[in-house]
Amino acid sequence: MNHRHFQPVFAFLITLAAAAEPEHHSADIVVYGDSPSSISAAIEAAENNTDVLLVSPVRHFGGIIANGLGSQDVDKRAGNAEPIGGLTREFFIRIARTYDHDATSPRYKFHSSRAGQAIDHWLAEKNILVLRNKRISEKPGSVTKEGGCITGFTCEDGTRISGKVFIDGTIEGDLMAFSGVSYTWGREGNDQYGETVGGVINPTLEQQFHFKVDPYNIPGDPSSGTIFGVQNEPVGTHGSADKSAMGFCLRLPLTKDPENKIPVTAPEGYNARDYELYRRFLAAGGGNDWLDGPGNKNDDRKAKLIDLGSWHELSGNFYGRNHGYPDGTYAERKRIYEEHRGYTQGLIHFLSTDPSVPVEIRAEWSQWGLCKDEFTDNGGWPRMLYLRSTRRMVSDYVITEADVIARPASSQCGRTLQPAPPVEDPIGVAWWFVDLHAARTVIKEGRVYNEGAFINYDNYAPFGIPYRSIIPKRADCTNLLVPSALSSSYAGYGALRLEWTYMVLGQSAGAAAVIALDKNLPVQDVPYPDLAAHLVSRGQKITVSKAGN
């Protein structure tokens, strides 16, 4: 037999087998996510000469910082820049250097494209192995564990990732959830942790309509159904639990510059009746600095707005339209993103063109458009929503409202909440208040009513974030750290949900992972004195000198 005739066949079969073999990557420390905590965790591990792999479910790193949130909550009401040290401070200095190469101070207001540029350069400089568009598979068994330790996970495209210590840097807590770690979402009732604003907030005073807006399709007729954007459900009892989440939005950079502007046209399927709530609000005499138009009316024709935020009774937050997101499938999250994007596009078109909108508002909005030089692969639209609250781990320490307040707080039901004592294992400092946006737009006494907003500017203090809040219960997993979807109540998370806080916790998670790896310890057994000493040596701030409010 002439075996030479079979050689091409054998070579072809070998090639097919190689092509069918799934991609596999392994590292001592695996960081999963695209958020700021993912970046700082990976860089902290790399700068400690550790074998680290950074796996992102999407193409672009930075999370919402690289997707529209260009105005950071730093040195606004709180004067809270003091806790920003270590890699977090370095990151904001690196952003400043994309504007001024010689900058030595951090910059907290910037364009998203500059943040993305700074992140990509930083990761390349550290020679970190980066995998993009590698999302964990939703199929059962995609995360494998042995003896309480994660051994690896499989991505949607079949790529296999293995490691010794894992860090879940996603805001959504996907690796955490798929690993079987205890978590929750939505709003706990006040009774669960003895809080005063843990669940439904009734009455809601913040972000509330101060003009009566009729909620029914035929004004005054409940049988006619509700106008779009109003949920026909009861407000609920103060302090009761539910699965709501504060409203999401798109954080939009916008411009007036004709050479850089993408006009915002009506989306497919646009129907002006979907914005009846806005029409009635304006007709009743309502208004705010969001609806009046982006930026400053005196901005010149080259003006570029860094970040169109939403924190008003009526703006770009679509209360009640996101409740399926936190624990939803990837398909459900995509649907919610697309709904928010389409509705935002339609809203801008409505405010720019609809005859019911006051002429001065139409004139202002019609000058603005999306930016050609932002999100160039997505038509000028941010690639993600601003996720104010999703999943939250439930661990041995749950950060609650008591950790945030400086003085006793009282609730409508007569409960008085005492401040929690300082924690013994701080790995960073949170310096913000309980900051909850509305979660639902419902009906109360025959009028449109926003429920769920609570912002306490007057009773908060900087507080140490305990190491225990970023590690799971020992029975759940012993080699995972969770710096973004950390263990907290809904109210407690309201003081944690700042991007710079995530980045602080990411660095601390990276440092703890290195120690756990070097000492061959479960993350629950990392010696806190060793971790604290290391963090301080790296410029991390784990205590502050100021007392707060």
For each of these PLM feature ranges, what is it?
Residues Q7-A17:
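Bacterial N-terminal signal peptides
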Residues L16-H24:
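Bacterial Sec-dependent signal peptides at the C-terminal "C-region" and cleavage site
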Residues H24-S35:
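Beta1/beta-strand and adjacent pyrophosphate-binding region of the FAD-binding site
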Residues S38:
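N-terminal Rossmann-fold NAD(P) dinucleotide-binding loop
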Residues A45:
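Aromatic pocket-lining residues of Rossmann-like dinucleotide-binding sites
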Residues T50-D51, S56-S142, T184, Q192-G194, ...:
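Conserved N-terminal/central alpha/beta ligand/cofactor-binding core
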Residues P140-R160:
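Conserved beta-strand-loop-beta-strand element in the redox core of flavoprotein oxidoreductases
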Residues T159-V165, G169-N549:
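Flavin (FAD/FMN)-binding glycine-rich loop and adjacent Rossmann-like elements that form
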